């Protein structure tokens, strides 16, 4: 919704995420325990037509190691896909392999290492292509209406409980697009 319909709303969770990212989002390089650390590093890939920003990249002796910061807890593959996209950008930009990275969960104060294997690379590439197709078509996928919805900042714009019920949608569409003359005959006006 953010990119297709230019809709964004703040809520407690988006604000907490901004606060959690304040330090890591301040662009710049430091050296920690002999390792160069780049914060807020711009990333891009001409091949994948991506551009973005890494929360943090550690330049270890064995190579670049992206670290993505997340507010909540580990759930699903979405953060892994984001981290992999960053690794793919780093590989293209630097001409080096990026075989692993990490996701730091702020609430848990813990890092989880992610292996950037071929399956994750292929899944990430397919996800990028699917998003690109959605942006081109300007059509959003159906709202999932699941346990994540009550915490989502876009809940009131998305209305998953309404959109997720086809009969209700048809009824609303019928009422919305009923000609005025028919409405007046029915005594609705």
Stretch-by-stretch model annotation:
Residues 24-25, 31, 80, 92, ...:
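Metal-cofactor-dependent catalytic cores
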